[in-house]
Amino acid sequence: PSIEAMAETYALADRDPDLATTISPYTNEPINRFLHIANSSEDLFMQNEMQRKLGQLTGTCFQRCVGMDAFNALHSVTYEIDEKYKTNYHDKFINFLTKMHEGNFVIGGAMTDVKGDRSKPPHQQADQDLYLRVVNRDDNGVYVSGAKAHQTGCINSHWMVVMPTLRLTENDKDYAIVGALPIETDGITYI
């Protein structure tokens, strides 16, 4: 059912573009509404209507909601971080989002860490790979290790956005990573 549900997110956009597509502010071309950043109450209403229709059509999870919600959150959070710290995360995010619009890609959201001993924060776990974390940084970027759970949506996606599953403290800064990677990246194992 997961493959058919994902396919329906594309099929609905073809059958009912008024419901399941909108115009990208970055490419000025139609995009799937799952890739759109909500800018108004009408956008939010249309997202909800599209999700309701897909629920009626599929009767199951259609696996694109976490990616859509992550993009909407990252749009504002990257801007706020840049305002406060004079970084350029928002521009990087917009460039990535534009690439996703151009390719009509599916974004899976990898949020749920496997957690281990839930009474302990990530940095106190006996196995550090029970939460996704940064293990190296260099001029090419960051390298992560760890596990995420319940990732059927990512298997059916083009890209996955990884993000923390809980509030973190300064001691857990290596676990405070949000990033995107193609689902076929070397080193990713799906079980």
Residue ranges and their predicted role:
Residues V114-I191:
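FAD-binding core of flavoproteins
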Residues P1-L12:
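N-terminal-proximal low-complexity accessory segments that begin disordered
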Residues N104-D117:
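A short, Trp-centered hydrophobic/proline-enriched beta-strand micro-motif
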Residues I3, I31-A38, P122-Q125:
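Glycine-rich loop at the start of a catalytic domain that most often binds anionic cofactors/ligands
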Residues A11-I107:
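Internal helix-loop-helix
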